[in-house]
Amino acid sequence: DLHSFPTRRSSDLHSHRGSIDFNTKEAKVTLDEQGRPIDIIVRRRTRATSLIEEAMLLANECVAQLLSDAGIETAYRVHERPAPDELKDALRILRELGLVEGSLAGALVTGSSAAIQEVLEDAAGTPAELFVNTVLLRAQRRAIYLPHNDGHYALGARAYCHFTSPIRRYADLLVHRALKAQLDGNADSREQREIGRSLAQLCRSCSERERVSDGAARDSQRVKIAEDYGDRKSVV
């Protein structure tokens, strides 16, 4: 049943694997033909987008697990546990506002993904929801690409990669090549050995370019939001 798939998948991730589901707001700026902002809306998660997202995550995880089980090096997407100092800072802020206390606070500072998810669920639907999500999200490490599998903390996944996504990354292509070679019985081909020799550098480059492109996207959006605000202010 496709309609219940996202709910069943999400329930399995939270209850059995301890995944974390951050609920943040993402703005989308609509531009006219001249590149001027004409509208700003908040992207909302719908049943359709949840279905696509969960299917994509499952495909990525299945491919990563297959390659990892076969001992294949590729561009794995790795997310490490949060740094203790970052969690302590987040806990201090949430405690001062009376949002976390007792044993839950102790579990959160150890990096328990279940505790983080519980704090997020407690804040859901309250005025503090967006703030709590932001504080805990900023305490997380940034996910990176590595040539070896080391799991994905936030997803609770033993292995993860970018195999399919709305945008085609170079990391996706590295995974496609590795998967095709494995399925064709050519995992030890000359081409794959050549890729393997430079894989660590390729992963570092993919991680760095992602940081740069994400920063450029945020800066561009801020500029357009400021332009839109300026236009509205001049009209008033």
Labelled PLM ranges:
Residues 4-236:
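Electropositive polyanion-binding surfaces
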